[in-house]
Amino acid sequence: MSESTNEDSGAGRSSLEENSNGQRSQSEEAIAEWRSSEQVENGTPSTSPPYWDIDDDDDFGSKPSQLFGKNTWTIEKFSDINKRELRGDVFEVGGYKWYILIYPQGCDVCNHLSLFLCVAHHEKLLPGWSHFAQFTIAVSNKDPKKSKHSDTLHRFWKKEHDWGWKKFIELPKLKEGFIDDSGCLTIKAQVQVIRERVDRPFRCLHYKYREELVRVYLGNVEQICWRFVEEKRSKLGRLIEDKAKWKSFCAFWMGLDQNSRRRMSREKMDVILKIVVKHFFVEKEVTSTLVMDSLYSGLKALEGQNKNKESRPRLMDTEESTAPIVSVDKDSFALVDDVLLLLEKAALEPLPKKEEKSSQNRTKDGNAGEEFSREAVERDDRRLTELGRRTVEIFVLAHIFSNKIEVAYQEAIAWKRQEELIREEEEAWLAESEQKGKRGASEKEKKSKKKQAKQKKNKNKGKEMRKEDKVRTQTEEREIEKEECVRAIAESSAEKPDTLGDVSDVSDSVDSSAEILQLDSEDRESSPVHWEMDASEVHPPSAGDTSRGRGNSFSIPNGVAERKGLSTMDDSSSTCSNDSIQSGVANGSYKGNVLNCQSQKWFSNGKIQPGKVSDSNSLASEKEHQPSRLASDPKNQSHSSDIRRVGEADIVISHIQKPESPKERSPVSKDPNMIQMKEKSAAVLSPSRAAPWNPPSPVQAKPEKKGVSNVEAVPNRKVISVKSPSSHHASPSREAQLQTVGPRADIQKIASPKPVEQPAPPMSRPLSAPIIPPTQAAPVISAVQTSTASLARSMSSTGRLGSPTHSQAYNPQSYKHAIVGSSGFTHPSSQSSGTSTLPPYSHPSPISVSNQSGFPINVGSWDVSSGGLLWTGGSSSTRDTTTTISGNHKTNTYNAPVVTTSIRPTNVQIGRTAQSLMTDEFPHLDIINDLLADEHGTMDNSVYRVPQQFNNQYSYHGGADLGISSRSRSYSDDGFHQSYGEYMPHSASSSPYGNGQTQSQWQMANMDFSLPAMRNQDDVSASATATYSYFDLDSSNPNLSGINGYRDFRPSNGH
């Protein structure tokens, strides 16, 4: 039907207006006729479909037929009413009381009739009350087809207790048949209270009220249902049209087992029906009740198919139903066939066509007298049932597919994709791991190569270090062998009868435990040391005392001795044999300052130049308990100085001692670059041919190979030579001449080779043996001495002899010339000195003793003449011992140096001179010396007292007379250009001892310096061989100790 309803709500009232554009097609007369046809006289049975008028047992509460009611209100003399509003009588429907409210002049509007359905006594209802109802209000017309009807669905509650239309109908139209001839207006109301459900579709309308609404709203219901079905079919159609997705879905579905398919093809009814109610039932929509009734009927039809219920014969005969898709199995919906086939059927099968046939009352000009067709009503009911069933089936199929099957399919696709992603990630991870492994292997290989290179480098470095150590050890061994060879050659050369002037080294080590020979008067008288010897020789330390000896170092003054000859005596030589000598060994360390200096005498013919004197320390300052050094270390070689005197000619040869640092005590740790080079220089004298004499030595040095030590860097070397006045007349004052000598090759050229011979056994030669002088050999060797400028504790000489040595002819000498010297005495001599390279050394104990003035320290009275320094207190044949003491002097009188450090006893070994040197040439020298002593008088052997006692005990070396060739140590200082010898007083007594013995031990410190037991000076010839002894505790009576007249050495510790 084409009648439309316009609803306007305001102020709790509803008004129904007649559509002015003619949309209300059914006249009141037609409606009245249709309405009257429903109410068949005498209760004619209804012709509704079998499922429409059935209230099932499962429906709870009141049935729709019980909730439906009607009411008719007739208003008389409507035109005469001047009231604003009128209320109708109260009636009850569905358990609630209702009434009709009208506004004859309109509610908030003019020229319109306003109609409302109200809840009676709403103010008395309980709070929270509500009534959900669908109602229809109609104004009757004389022509029933022209009657005015309005339908609506509303929920009444406290604030909305009335609902209707403000503009139900215009007032002028009421005169067109709505008001009858008596002036009465009839209003009719139909109310259907709804008991809604949310879990499943439910029955809403009474069948009679539904039949009335179906004729009007059937098209709206169809439109709603087909819209939903088309939506679901289109979705399924898109899935089927997508071939790839459909193929994938088919593969997925075919891959499932039967149980999975069956389980996925079923769903609970409650789940689906809840969704159906929620989707289709909408409040404020008048057709919602009809849709819900349609779904309810369709659900009942599905359930009835499964129960094989037979419907009424007339329905079955007239209705042809389509093939079912969904079946009801107990409380579940199940797909009747395979899901693939059902999807294709639902998507491709067309829907039933809409009926073009409309109601007979739909046209405004319809015949009023036409009877209502029962068949039309039944057809509409069947159509609503089919719409409901089809909608439920599509809904169930769509729900099962969308919520179960498609979800499983999407999960499978997602799982597969996830597996692919995982596989891709694993492959990427494996590739990355492989790359990392390659990088790690590469880095590891690099590290390994680097480590191997480092290990190889360290290994090569270790090999190089071991090679260097091996080379250094071999070098040190070779140097030691060379030193031993040089030492052995020197000893062998010194002991040869025809080469009397060999010098192997400038260092003479004086050992504290060296054998000291005490000569008695008889031995000294027959000693050949008293014979004049025109030779210069420096002996190396013997093999027995090289490992213990530590000597002083002295230097050669830079000047030329202009005397006629040279004479050398060896203080350590003796004519006694080994059997008659008892050697005393001094063990232990000595505390205190020990001035172990060698008595020297220095006569200079020329003027000494102070500017060429190098400052140095002559005595090494040693600490207490200093261990002995090995003699193989060149730095431990002590250098002695000898004074040769023939008449007025005196030559001073001093040697330098380099103190040893604690780091250089072991010969193994010695730096190869600092190996001390020893060179052998020989001064060939004109000796008389005599039997060889060897000094006693506990260990005979074995000569190995002859050569000169190799030196890497040799500083400036100075060649020292002595010129004889017979060939060259030198001026009284002569400058030192420096000659720089080349390295190793030049030195080896200078050094004269000497054959190695086994020394003859030591033996004493009788004085009466005849001596045949040998032929003189021309000397060709000059001495080379090297010194380093970095020596911190060396005592350098005042100058260097600048004239080179040259050969001289041998001239026989007289006894006079042999003693006092003359111009005719031209005994050739060559000066020799050892060569040593001394590395810098700094000792903590500073001793400042240097020589600048060049004057010797002389204890006797002396004066300076043009010929040199001459003694004024005695004749030229007198021997004197000049001792220089540098002690702890508190006064500075005579400009003496102040020494504040303790000096250990320094062992000085005096070079040995071959005894046959002067004995062969002057066999009666002792007798001549005695005669000369009677003529000139004997010079006092002065024993001096220092003005201040030393801190500890000291013993002087060479305290006895030295004869013609005496030794002197010269000190020079930067600021004191005078002799220190004047500081010490003389002793006037020339013969302090009465027993004829000469004192060999000097008492120091607390000892008595009066020397009550000094030997008589008469024995002049024997005093030159005085031996030196060290500290002897039992020195009060020197004559009591000893064996067979020789002195017994006692150390200071009493052992």
From Swiss-Prot:
Residue stretches of biased makeup (Basic residues): 447-460
One GO process term, biological-process aspect: autophagosome organization
Region Disordered: start-end pairs: 1-56, 352-380, 431-590, 603-772, 820-845
Subcellular location: Cytoplasm
A GO term for molecular function: protein histidine kinase binding
Compositional bias (Low complexity): 502-513
Major localisation: cytoplasm
Biased amino acid composition, Basic and acidic residues: 433-446, 461-486, 524-537, 657-668
Gene Ontology CC annotations of this record: cytoplasm
Polar residues bias locations: 37-46, 569-586, 723-740, 823-845
Amino-acid biosynthesis is among the record's keywords: no
The entry's keywords: Coiled coil, Cytoplasm
Knockout consequences: No visible phenotype under normal growth conditions, but the double mutant plants traf1a and traf1b, or muse13 and muse14 are extremely dwarf when grown at room temperature.
All copies of domain MATH, residue ranges: 68-191
Coiled-coil stretches noted in the UniProt entry, renumbered to this chain: 441-496
CDD domains (alphabetical): MATH (cd00121)
PANTHER family: TNF RECEPTOR-ASSOCIATED FACTOR HOMOLOG 1A
Assembly: Interacts with AHK3. Interacts with ATG6, SINAT1, SINAT2, SINAT5 and SINAT6.
Function statement: Functions redundantly with TRAF1B in the regulation of plant immune response. Contributes to the turnover of the nucleotide-binding domain and leucine-rich repeat-containing (NB-LRR) immune receptors SNC1 and RPS2. May associate with an E3 ubiquitin-protein ligase complex, which modulates ubiquitination and subsequent degradation of NB-LRR immune sensors to maintain their homeostasis. Functions redundantly with TRAF1B in the regulation of autophagosome formation. Required for SINAT1- and SINAT2-mediated ubiquitination and destabilization of ATG6.
UniProt name for this protein: TNF receptor-associated factor homolog 1a
Organism field: Arabidopsis thaliana (Mouse-ear cress)
